[in-house]
């Protein structure tokens, strides 16, 4: 059974092909609101070919989106090119999670899929950290209850404000520096961004430990998760495909 999973985020659209639970290929493109459904359809066809599949091989599609305009174009492309009406992660979809928030309907589809992936792959209690355009932390208990969500600025968003808001600071790659003892502008920016953000991550995790009276693991996912997971012993699991695993489990719960 071949499931195409689509994660539409503010910065990137990531497409994953899941073959009987195995992630067979993932592809990342820039999120652009002005892409037409035909453009998305051509991309889907190309990505399928790169993974060794044809459009007719796709049995179903599931979409997680936080960008409604792009989601509508993508959905239209899937209907046209694959002749499939995709499942959308949102209200009415069974996840197996109990979202114990003040406004559960406002929880992002990406966060829901992340939490499902973390819980069904690794069990609870678990803290899910997603390093995307925004950085989110969501806590899932042993009985699959999502009891807390934290949202803050993503590292790329913060970094862009640094070089876009100053006249002479250049754009730099977000990477783990060799040393905090920087001796020129670019290394100084890289070290400053990295250690400032890493410190915020560790302080946030520490506060969860302080306020929650149980042991839990921390799983990191998202575009820059590897950079920070390698720099701290407070992150237990690195899983770049967590959202796709979550969408696979959500899909399975709704069709079986």
Curated annotation (Swiss-Prot):
Record function comment: Catalyzes the phosphorylation of pantothenate (Pan), the first step in CoA biosynthesis.
UniProt: K(+) binding residues: 130
Main location: cytoplasm
InterPro entries in the record: ATPase_NBD (IPR043129), Type_III_PanK (IPR004619)
Biochemical pathway: Cofactor biosynthesis; coenzyme A biosynthesis; CoA from (R)-pantothenate: step 1/5
UniProt protein name: Type III pantothenate kinase
UniProt record similarity statement: Belongs to the type III pantothenate kinase family.
Enzyme class: transferase
Subunit text: Homodimer.
Residues the record marks as active site: 110 (proton acceptor)
